[in-house]
């Protein structure tokens, strides 16, 4: 009788991937990255262990929003003070803080618990083409071949 393989935290090797977000649809990029952050692309996936790899996203300012999402999709947050509801459109985020737009999209696809927050720390987003992780020798992923 075979037993199910359960990975232990000490046995996991984390890789580094780099993804160019230029002209890639936001939702398709987010689903692939969330899957890699969770470790679901590995045959040894264990749901209760942080198995995911590190993902570097460059050119976040040039991500594509389809339809009228740039003007109609609204992100809300509250300051916990009376009248403190703030709203920003996706186009506004893409213009002024493109890293935050990708982080909001990807973090929304991760589990809402301590493990999901830990997996979210493996995401590194940069608006331009430069990043500070050259020492990790990231492997380039072509997102169009994965979707």
Curated annotation (Swiss-Prot):
GO molecular function: mRNA binding; structural constituent of ribosome
Superkingdom of origin organism: Bacteria
Pfam families xrefs: Ribosomal_L13 (PF00572)
Similarity field: Belongs to the universal ribosomal protein uL13 family.
Subunit composition and interactions: Part of the 50S ribosomal subunit.
SUPFAM superfamilies reported for this sequence: Ribosomal protein L13
Identification of the protein by name: Large ribosomal subunit protein uL13
PANTHER family registered for this protein in UniProt: LARGE RIBOSOMAL SUBUNIT PROTEIN UL13M, RIBOSOMAL PROTEIN L13
CDD domains: Ribosomal_L13
């Amino acid at each position: 009788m075979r037993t199910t393989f359960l990975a232990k935290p000490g046995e996991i090797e984390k890789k580094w991937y780099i993804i160019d977000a230029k002209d890639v649809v936001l939702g398709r990029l987010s689903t692939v990255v969330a899957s890699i952050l969770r470790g679901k692309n590995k045959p040894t996936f264990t749901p209760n262990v942080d198995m995911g790899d590190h993902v570097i996203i460059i050119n976040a300012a040039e991500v594509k929003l389809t339809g009228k999402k740039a003007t109609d999709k609204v992100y809300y947050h509250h300051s916990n003070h009376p009248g403190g509801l703030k709203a920003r459109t996706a186009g506004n985020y893409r213009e002024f803080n493109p890293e935050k737009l990708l982080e909001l999209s990807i973090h929304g696809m991760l589990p809402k618990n301590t493990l999901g927050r830990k997996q979210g720390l493996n995401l590194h987003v940069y608006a331009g083409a430069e990043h500070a992780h050259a020492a990790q020798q990231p492997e380039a992923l072509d997102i169009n071949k994965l979707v």
